Amino acid sequence: MTQMQQTILDAFNFRHATKRFDANKKISESDFNTILETGRLSPSSLGLEPWRFVVIQNREIRDKLKAISWGAQGQLDTASHFVLILARKNVTSQSDYVQHMIRNVKKYSEASIPATEKKFDDFQTNFHINDNDQSLLDWARKQTYIALGNMMTSAALLNIDSCPIEGFDLDAVTQFLTDDGIIDEAHFAPSVMVAFGYRETEPKDKVRQTQDDIVEWLE
């Protein structure tokens, strides 16, 4: 095994779902910016980046979230950094956001845009993504989990702990974020939370199925 291979596997063995962090230990600005950059640079379907990362350091906001996030009780109190990942709504070829991405970010030529839009529409139709608003949002939420995984892995490579969190009242969190002006519900919806910091106690040994249990080779 090469040194790089060992480093990668060590990071995955290090990572665990940390329920409580050492509240006295804080992640450096440089390290946390690296974690955010791995989220920003993550792949997404058609490269549309249908996400937003809200870093919640405000204690009052954390306390309000704690009341409606049953799976984040220890993390909201102790995490060095707490991130809410939002999924973008209405990601269709004619939406203002997609038009912005293809024209201003990706800078496609005007001549190529109609073909790009058709390819996008055909893809969403074939996968039943654009059947309704909920299927569109579900697709966008899938993309946020790619960024989530990359952020947690990069944290582990920096010896920083993390915990992904789905344990929250979706409707209540959405209402709170909307009422407090944190999100525009017309354009974004909560997808997943993730906490970062340094473990308070050592975890139990990692338990996973073997490769033989989960991998099938077709040769």
From Swiss-Prot:
Pfam families: Nitroreductase. It comes from the Bacteria. CDD domains: NfsB-like. Its EC number is 1.-.-.-. It is an enzyme of class 1 (oxidoreductase). PANTHER family: NADPH NITROREDUCTASE, OXYGEN-INSENSITIVE NAD(P)H NITROREDUCTASE. Belongs to the nitroreductase family. This is Putative NAD(P)H nitroreductase SSP0379. It comes from Staphylococcus saprophyticus subsp. saprophyticus (strain ATCC 15305 / DSM 20229 / NCIMB 8711 / NCTC 7292 / S-41).
